[in-house]
Design a protein with these regions (language model features):
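Basic, amphipathic N-terminal segments that precede the first structured/catalytic domain
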Residues: 1-41, 171-173
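Short, flexible loop/turn motifs enriched in small residues
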Residues: 38, 46-49
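Residue-level detector of short, conserved catalytic/binding motifs and their immediate flanks
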Residues: 39-41, 52, 121
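Catalytic cores of nucleic-acid endonucleases
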Residues: 59-126, 148-154
Length: 173
């Protein structure tokens, strides 16, 4: 197994087998501006028999302060919208690669050969400096915003977890 690690938002993710990970943000298609304004998660990884779309954030806005100013309200909505867009765009791009609608030369044979009709797809946001009480709030907001996409792709779960939980789950070193 050739190991792969990556640093995102001040956290070291991995070590993953290089055949288990697709660095969507580092792909040529993404880097070459294939689609302007495309927003993606950090990477897609085959982890513990699940396909995980993983986004990393260093912190969240404090949702309890959203009514304190127009700027705080805008930051709050931008945070939710940004993550939702990243998951939507990433799922669309990834599955266009898997189905061969776009060149999939950067995707490992292992990922290409998974039986996508049977695997669980999970959306994960790892937040380094999370307000613990805000994780459920943000998860619920993202569930509402992503419910259609989650139904289309039969995604059962979205998780917002802090760095400590990510370490216990084997995402972060």
């Amino acid at each position: 197994m050739e190991g792969y690690e990556t640093i995102e938002s001040g956290m070291t993710f991995g070590t993953y087998d290089k055949d288990d990970i697709f660095r969507i943000e580092k792909s040529e298609m993404y880097q070459n501006g294939f689609v302007n304004d495309l927003r993606t998660v950090e990477f897609v990884v085959w982890h513990k028999e699940k396909l995980v779309f993983l986004e990393a954030k260093s912190s969240t806005p404090n949702y309890q302060n959203i009514d304190k100013s127009k700027e705080k309200t805008e930051k709050y909505h931008e945070f939710i919208n940004s993550i939702a867009e990243k998951f939507e765009d990433s799922m669309d791009l990834y599955f266009s690669l898997i189905t061969g609608r776009q060149s999939n030369s950067e995707v490992s044979e292992k990922l290409l050969k998974l039986d996508y009709s049977k695997i669980n797809i999970v959306l994960v946001v790892v937040i380094k400096n999370a307000f613990k009480d805000s994780l459920l709030h943000y998860r619920d907001k993202l569930n509402m915003q992503l419910r259609t996409k989650m139904k289309i792709w039969n995604v059962k779960n979205i998780f917002l977890i802090d760095e400590e939980t990510a370490r216990k789950k084997g995402f972060v070193k």
